[in-house]
A protein has these predicted regions:
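Sec-dependent signal peptide recognition
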Residues: 3-10
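C-terminal motif of bacterial Sec signal peptides marking the signal peptidase cleavage site
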Residues: 14-16
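Primarily secretory-pathway and cell-envelope proteins
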Residues: 20-91, 96, 150-205
């Protein structure tokens, strides 16, 4: 009995240390979540003019989604900033395949089949690329979404290509995607950056 009593203070100290570690880990996890939310909201605030100067380094990971005719459309991308740079014909070269984001290929996932420019696209996950031009852009849906930038891009893996004319838009500092509903079965994937906008129409089957 005396031996057990002797060790009790040490047991209490160890238990207290473990409890403190758990609390610290919980705080750390909560802080990480807070940072993620802040980075996402930051881009929206910059685009709305609520933050005068974009000082965030890097290209935060963002997402866009909508449900069209019970078809969940989900886009994952990274969002670079203008930051006073020349974008078109500068940072983004004309007439070359562009990741239309940063770091990894932008991915678009459809939970149901869709039709794009007369081509049926099976439900699945795909890479979204563009080829910007001075007068027109080519929008591309490609099978290989697991690649860095366009390092492994292969035109033979394209499912569909659509030529569109970009339209002028109010300044958007951080590249942003939207899935805009047109009617019950039709929608468009919209890309805004700097003062240009391009859109890829599709129909949910």
């Amino acid at each position: 009995m005396i031996k057990t009593t002797k060790w009790l203070p040490f047991i209490f100290i160890i238990a207290a240390c473990n409890n403190n570690k758990s609390a610290d880990n919980s705080k750390s996890d909560n802080h990480a979540d807070h940072q993620m939310v802040t980075a996402h909201d930051y881009c929206d605030s910059v685009n709305k003019g609520l933050i005068a100067e974009d000082t965030l380094k890097g290209s935060p990971h963002r997402s866009a989604m909508n449900t069209i005719n019970n078809n969940h459309v989900h886009i994952e991308y990274n969002s670079p900033g203008v930051k006073g740079r020349t974008i078109w014909g500068g940072l983004v070269a004309y007439d070359k395949v562009w990741v239309t984001g940063a770091h990894s290929a932008t991915s678009v996932q459809f939970s149901k089949d869709v039709e794009i420019n007369g081509t049926k696209i099976p439900a699945g996950k795909y890479a979204f690329f563009t080829i910007p031009g001075k007068e027109k852009w080519t929008l591309v849906l490609n099978k290989n979404y697991e690649q860095h930038l366009t390092d492994d891009y292969n035109e033979a893996e394209d499912l569909v290509r659509v030529d569109v004319v970009p339209t002028q838009h109010d300044m958007v500092q951080r590249l942003t995607y939207h899935v805009n509903k047109i009617d019950d079965t039709k929608a468009e994937i919209v890309v805004n950056w700097e003062k240009l906008q391009v859109a890829l129409p599709f129909a949910s089957l």
